[in-house]
Amino acid sequence: MTVSAKNIPAPDLVPVRRALISVSDKTGIVDFARSLAAREVALASTGGTAALLARSGIGVMDVSQLTGFPEIMDGRVKTLHPAVHGGLLAIRDDPDHRSAMETHAIKPIDLVVINLYPFEDVRFGGGDYAATVENIDIGGPAMLRAAAKNHAYVAVVTDPADYARVLEALEKNDGALPYRLRQELAAKAYARTAAYDAAISQWFAESLAIAEPEWRSFGGRLAQVMRYGENPHQQAGFYATGEKRPGVATARQVQGKQLSYNNINDTDAAFELVCEFDPKKVAAVAIIKHANPCGVAEGTSLAEAYRKALACDPVSAFGGIVALNRILDAEAAEEIAKIFTEVIIAPDATEEAQAIIATKKNLRLLLTEGVADPRAPGLSAKTVAGGLLVQTRDNGVIDDLDLRVVTRRAPSEKEMANLKFAFRVAKHVKSNAIVYARDLATVGIGAGQMSRVDSARIAARKAEDAAAAAGGQPLTKGSVVASDAFFPFADGLLSAVEAGATAVIQPGGSMRDDEVIKAADEHGIAMVFTGMRHFRH
């Protein structure tokens, strides 16, 4: 039994006799209010909600009748009144509080049903500054916080999904709500207002271009409870921030089992990578395993791109994630369905493609209704012990003007196309990253090594293994190489030379750039500096 600050025990059951309803999302509110009214709960409401309930034949008192004060300033001030907040905050079993209520004719409010102005929708929907500010709710959060604080006597409902739960509890407890439920609803209300305020503060920081605000908050809504996290002994949930960026968080799952923690992490990595390639110009496919690409390719069709991507590392591709930058068609679906695949994510899928995928009942198909802009601003965050590392999203994209040829030999037109392709891929490979590419397809990928030369050697060996399995020569012969960061020594470049590469793209910026350039010239290698690093950890 919890007690108040005045050492007054909180009652287990609180009868609901009076409710205040004020909602922006009116989903289910008419039926919920009608059920309350059937239990002879007195209803008070505001503005559009009151009008809707009245039109639906439900007896309701306008909040101005409760307060004795009209709504003013275009509805900005309507519930910020002692008659409302006194009714929410009063400790019912405190004689002093009861006396104050009697003196000021304040009636207790037992149930508050509120959801907030749709600030997040306006923010991410491209509303202008004035419209976004106008959708910052003031009275709603104030009532939610007041009711949640006084959960000893008041129940607060913020989510239409909880209406049925509340009605079931009222039915079970003869019109009263139990303390545990009031606690849980209060916790949810505070989580909601915290996320709401986080969205507002984040929007202000973005609008004013404040890169490192003094306080930083993040909010999200539970989208899915996971069976477990990265490993079976870890608990996990997936939270959606409300950002409209096409991707795993906003995608529609057409079929397949529930996504796991690792599925979501890998699918996000896959789709972010494939969005580097403009679907209006080229078909592109990425195959991902453990958040690293094991094959990426461009093609004249998705099917061709998939076959080229798969050839890079067919062993690792088994049980992987496949991302496409165009509408999944039947030809590509047939190719993908030939091996075990966990998830396919694409902007859309034809009916024929969906029918093919449907034959693999456990294969998850996600449709995003578009591709993400790789240049779009945003934030990424990582937890560390006792803190958060927050940075802007790596939205750096190289243009031709960024490229600087630093060797005696310049890349050919074909080499340059492959260099730019490989560097796009390297951006999405865990550091240290080395990518061999040929004919606009990866042929060897080295990821996550502490030494860049080891990544170069692993990438070449992977290419050799794939070639040996296919009965051919390693495709690193005549390939190009991309590195996510500079070569600190010439050894990494020499490994690429040994593998048969003819051109290299890297950020540059090492103290030994001259040594690396000299080695490239000695071996007839063309090398391009981008001036942009893409570490990924």
From Swiss-Prot:
Protein name per UniProt: Bifunctional purine biosynthesis protein PurH
EC number: 2.1.2.3, 3.5.4.10
Organism: Chelativorans sp. (strain BNC1)
Molecular functions (GO terms): IMP cyclohydrolase activity; phosphoribosylaminoimidazolecarboxamide formyltransferase activity
Family under the similarity heading: Belongs to the PurH family.
Highest taxon of source: Bacteria
Pathway connected to this protein: Purine metabolism; IMP biosynthesis via de novo pathway; 5-formamido-1-(5-phospho-D-ribosyl)imidazole-4-carboxamide from 5-amino-1-(5-phospho-D-ribosyl)imidazole-4-carboxamide (10-formyl THF route): step 1/1; Purine metabolism; IMP biosynthesis via de novo pathway; IMP from 5-formamido-1-(5-phospho-D-ribosyl)imidazole-4-carboxamide: step 1/1
Gene Ontology BP term (one): 'de novo' IMP biosynthetic process
Domain notes from UniProt: The IMP cyclohydrolase activity resides in the N-terminal region.
GO cellular component, one term: cytosol
Record's catalysed reaction(s): (6R)-10-formyltetrahydrofolate + 5-amino-1-(5-phospho-beta-D-ribosyl)imidazole-4-carboxamide = 5-formamido-1-(5-phospho-D-ribosyl)imidazole-4-carboxamide + (6S)-5,6,7,8-tetrahydrofolate; IMP + H2O = 5-formamido-1-(5-phospho-D-ribosyl)imidazole-4-carboxamide
Cited SUPFAM superfamilies: Cytidine deaminase-like, Methylglyoxal synthase-like
